[in-house]
Structure formats: structure tokens, C-alpha cells
Amino acid sequence: MTVPPAVPPSDSPPVPGPRRRWQAGTLTYTAGGLAVLFCWMLWGDFAWQLKERAAPPVVQLMLRKFQASDFLTGLFLLSLPAAVGLFLGPLISYRSDRHRGPWGRRIPFLLITSPIATLAMCGLAFSPWIGTALHARMGWAPASLHLTVIVVLGLSWTVFEFATVAANAVFGGLINDVVPREVIGRFFGMFRAVSLLAGMLFNFYLIGHAKEHFLPILAGIGLLYGGGVVLMCLRVKEGDYPPPEPPAPGQRPGLVGAVRTYARDCFSRPYYLWVFASMALAQLAFSPVNLFCVYAAESFGLSMSTYGRYLVAAYAGSLLLAYPLGWMADRFHAVRMALGTLAVYAAVMAVGYFGIVGPASFGAVFFAHVLLSGCYFTGAAALGQMLFPKMKFAQFASAGNLILALGNIGFGPAMGLLLDQLGHDYRYTFAAGCLLALLGLLAGVVVYRRWLALGGAAGYAAPE
């Protein structure tokens, strides 16, 4: 028998296998490229979320300082943003989906709106001085001083909301365009973690000083927001997009044709109407407590410092859950995550209505509210990206926000008026949250069954 000659060992190292790559449209990422993308996007989100966490509660405290009613607070903080979003969100998103330029289709809109939001936050910060100076200049009666300040505050808030709504209409679209679909749930988990860190920093260090030092808080965060988002836009690159769809035969040019196309795309299929309703009701369910939580804390004897610590504790819990919830959304799908969270939230809100009797019980239910709403906004964050058509994502997302805006326009003042009539009994905010969560859960079950019929997690394709 012939023995084959021994093969001498090779001195060359083994050839490594091909590195894994992720793709989002025409963009391709290695692990390092994906990490760089995440870092810049998360930096922009940190600036964004710090603005979102700071502006509403500080403005709420300013409104209370100048003796605004609950009705006016609901009008400012919920109905006004909804009214702006009702027409501006669809317009910006429709144009963004169809825009093609050297900077992409999302980044130009963010570069324009960020400085406007910064200026508006500075306007909010200086509203008391501007209002006082205007009142003195016009020689109005002393009794109208607070009203003058509130009007100036409202004008600055309106400009702020115009910029925020316009930016929000395209920020989610930017994520949809540059983040690979395979990791979108985990990406939103990290987004949520950054949001929570921003909330923890604000509520631990700043909320207790907001009544006396709202000027440096609002102006400083406004400058950080403008600079942070602009820097993100300069460092993140969009890919190439196919040309927008040509107008349909017989479609009228201009605004009328665009409105008809928008309405036909978004509202002609019952499936998407159920999706919009379920998402709007779910988000609206968190609004009653969110809108009046500062006033509720004071009415139940909770100081602003203790209130801030409850928020920080809830944010810390949500922070620990953020990445696991994002992984679960990738693994089990955002539709299932939304349904489970809403069911638990409805039960907790019922406990809040019947069980809150003082600061300790309010703090416990409020802690659960923040934690569970955070679970929803993390686990269901990618719901739109997973259900809407990819190339028309911003348009469909704005249609969902339009439905939410219609609810907010009426709900904010109605809830405030109800609380004014009920002697500011803020337990009713928990009852309203329970009812809306149950309605959102029912609509979500309809969506879930139709999603399964369209292929479910394995074979779903968004109908167009």
C-alpha cells in the first residue's frame, strides 16, 4: 500500500470568510459602518429627545405660573400641536417622499426646521419679559398682564410646534431610509434608551428648578437641539432612490391632484384605516395622564422634586428594558408587542382610578404609567416601518398622525374642560386612559388578524 506523502503545513494564515453586511436600499453597511450610523443617529436623537422632554413640562409650569386654566393648558399642549400637524404633517411628508436632491429626501427638511425650533425655544424662554414689556408699552390695564404673557407664550409655542411637526414628519422617514430592516427593532430600542437618558437628566437635574430658571433651561436646550440635529444631518448619508411615481393618467396637477393621490394611497384600504385607528387610540391613551401629570402630582401632595425622582426611577427601569424590548420586536413583531402592552396598561389605569388616595399611591401608579407607556413606545416603535409601504413611509406615517391629530384637537380641551367642571379631580385622567387603551386594544386585534392573513411575520408585504 502506498502511503501519500505528508503535506507540509502552510505558513499563510487562513482566509477569513466574508464579513457580514447589512443593506438599506442602496446603502450597504459593515458592522463598523452600522456602528458609526447608530452613533450619529443616536446623537441627533439625544438632542431631539431632550427638547421633547423639556419643552412641554416647562411650558406647563409657566402656564400655571401665569394662571392659565386647565382648558387653556389642554388647548396649548395637545390641541394646538394636533391642529398644526393636521395640515403641515401630510404636506411635508408627501413632498419629502417625492423629493430627490443631492442631500437626499429627508435631511434638507431637517436642516431647515432645526434652527427655527431653536429660535422658538428662545422665544418661549423670554416670553414673560417680552409680554411684560409689550403690556407696559401698550398701556393696558394691570389685570391683563398675565393674559399678555400667555399670548406671547402661545405665539412662540405655535412657531415651535410648526418646526417640530415639520421635522417629526421626516425624522421617522430618515430612520426608515437609512437603517437596515433586520435591526430596526433593536435600533429603536437604543433610540428609546437615549430618550430615557435625556429624560432622566432633565427630571433629575432640571425639573426642580424649572419654575425659577426656565429661561436658561429652555434657551440652553434649544441651542443644543439645533446644533445636535444639524451635526447629525451633516454626518449621516442617505442613499439613492428610484424616481417618484409619475402622475396617474388623468390626475390633475398641483395641490388638488396631490391631495387626491394622498387620500387614495392612504385612506382607500380598510386595512390601513384600522392600522391608523389602533395606533392613534394607543397613543391617545397615554395623553390624559401625560397632559395633566404635573398638576395631578401637586393635587395629590407630591412635590416637584419627588415627582422628578419617580420619573427618573421609571426611566431607569425603561432604560434596562429598552434593548430587550427592541430585540423582542425584531423576534416577535411590533404588532404583538403593542397588543400585550396595551392590555396591561388598561388594567393599571383602572387601578389608578379606583386606588389613588394620596401621594404614595399616585406615585406608584404614575411610575407604572411611565414604565408601561415606555414599553409601548419601545416595543411598538417600529410598527409603521413594519406595516407601511417603504417608499411611501413618511406619507403613510403622516396619515396616521393626521388621525391622531383629529383626536387630540378635541380631546385636549375636552379633558381640560371636564377637569375644570369636576373640581380638578385628576383621577379621571386614569379613567380616560383606561377607556382609550381598551379601544386601542380592540382595534389592534383587528389589525393583528388582517396582518396574519397578509402573511404575518414570515411573508407580510404591505398592500399598495
Where are these regions (language model features)?
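Helix-to-loop junctions at the C-terminal end of transmembrane segments
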Residues: F87-W103, L321-H333, L419
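A membrane-interface helix-boundary motif in multi-pass transporters
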Residues: R105-P108, A141-A143, G208-L223, L417-A437
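Helix-loop boundary and gating motifs at the non-cytosolic
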Residues: R19-A82, Y271-S278, A282-F300
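C-terminal transmembrane helical hairpin of 12-TM major facilitator-type secondary transporters
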Residues: V335-F377
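Juxtamembrane intracellular "pre-TM" segments in multi-pass secondary transporters
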Residues: P13-G33, P242-V275, P463-E464
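Structural signature of the two symmetry-related core transmembrane helices
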Residues: R106-G123, R336-V351
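Multi-pass alpha-helical transporter architecture, strongest
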Residues: L124-G131, G226-V236, A431-E464
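Intracellular juxtamembrane helix-capping segments at the cytosolic ends
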Residues: V59, A166-V179, C375-P389
